[in-house]
Amino acid sequence: DAQESRGLGDVYKRQFLIADRKTLTPILWEEGANRTWGELPGAGEHALDAAASPRFPKRRWRGAGTAIPVFSLRTEEDFGVGEFYDLKRLIDWAAATGQCVIQVLPINDTTMTGTWEDSYPYNANSTFALHPQFIRLPAAGVVEDDEYRTLRNELNALPEIDYERVNRHKLRLLRRAFERHGTRTAARRDYKDFIAANRHWLIPYAAFCTLRDETGTPDFTRWGGFARYDRKTVDAYCRSHNRDIAFHCYVQYHLHTQLSEVCAYARAHGIVLKGDLPIGISRTSVDAWLYPHLFHMDSQAGAPPDAFSAVGQNWGFPTYNWERMARDGYAWWRARMAKMAEYFDAFRIDHILGFFRIWEIPTHAVHGLLGYFNPALPYSADELRGMGFDTQDGRYTTPAPDEHMLGELFGDLAGEVRATCMKEGRLLPAYATQRKVAARFPGDDEHQTRLREGLMALLDDVLFIEDPRRKGYFHPRIAPHSTHAYRRLDGERRAAFDRLYTDFFYHRHNRFWQESALRKLPVLLSATEMLTCGEDLGMIPDSVPETMHELQILSLEIQRMPKTPGELFADPAHYPYFSVCTTSTHDMNPLRAWWEEDRELTARFYHEALGIGGDVPYFCE
């Protein structure tokens, strides 16, 4: 107090602070030494230091969260699988422990065959519809009778989800509830509003599900007169199957209602729900049926080879026809994002690299090794000729096996391959693609497996891949240095190939891909107010982090997958501020399970990353 300080012979010392408005309890003091004031104001006077500027530390906000699939949640009210309503308990726990984000895997309907193969959450039959497995049955009109309770207890007692039984019984009980409550529900104002707001995707989805069940396949190319979507034809079908159509609408209405309730609950408790946006769509989906012109149905999305897959990855999804999408201002994307924003306040873009360029694989190929980037700037035949590679005779674009190569790939089966699969040193047309090879040798016995894998490796053995949409233009094959085609090059040509390969994969496309992303991503980001996070793992061009920073998209940092070459574990202290950091992805073991996988690796993490000495605990507890 200034008056109490008078006459004490000391200068008046002070500091700025932030205090609670009601209790005046200090919350944060400014940094640095005390400020001094030699001459104090008199009684009833006030002093103002207009030049003073508080030195509060720049504390950047940081938040903690939990990532978990909805299907992994467990409560007594479940029916053998985690449900939307289970998120309420998770929200309570997150709020009580100071967390602010809950991230889930994709929640769209993946029902294709009614088998466990449908359980993969990244292969949805619709990018708008929700998966019926997440519904709380009693809240959708299912009676909790003895049959229901017996089934619920039996399914909940299982150590793992019985995907087929859970979904079969849920749909059966929902059918029964629909017969009892469907007409009354359809008369409700909120139901009518839901139908009106979602008709553009809901009615085609309901027709798709009905046709799928009627024909026994989600492959719409096998639906005869319905193989090509025609609105008038489908509308007539819906009228003649109105009860089935109404059932699927009934289920989606209840899923929407339940998830909307959970979202409101999360927001009321200060918890952000973060969704997951898959990069691809299924080629047997409502979206592909309605809008085939928006996708390259003759191609497959995947990934180049990496430490986890020597032949690359083939996800099977058709790739996007971005040029066609741009004509209507990316309307399909904007509608998809708007639907997602009804439930989520943040989202993760799965494989954000796909918005810069996607790894595209022809449908005749199986291995990711035979893919190429799209969009890209492939070399023209003239460019390659100028670098010493004449593509006209096919020696660099088709396999040319010699005796040494056949022996290396097939061993004692080399003679059989030469006699049955080849003519004049080239593969016969019946074995000219990997899909044909897979169809010829589908068995799992050793003989068929060796022939199949050997022939596929033989088909991988090329240096260039011709662009399927630009004849006379060629992409260097990814990771070619172990191929026989590369090893057969003389020293001069090998050096020339190395130069063009390095330029192609590390320099030629940087600005080109950045411009490509900047035409698409801002449209997505402006469609909603969701916080955008990108999964930017893998083979990352320099332009990707630059663009993400420019567009304020958070990066993903995985401690066990460091982005700096030579690091075993990433150091969180060096992560960018605008990032999501975690110990692992959903494709990897969580921390406690990983701890017990490799004791030597765990010891290095314990001693080097955590900086703790002594014996390593056997369990991560």
Question: What is each stretch, according to the model?
Answer:
Residues 2-12:
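Short, small-residue-biased leader/transition segments that mark boundaries at the very start
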Residues 4, 31-32:
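Intrinsic disorder/low-complexity segments enriched in polar/small residues
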Residues 13-19:
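Short, aromatic- and glycine-rich surface loops/edge beta-strands on solvent-exposed regions
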Residues 19-31:
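Short acidic/polar inter-strand loop motif in beta-rich domains
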Residues 25, 33-621:
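Catalytic cores of glycan-processing enzymes that make or break glycosidic bonds
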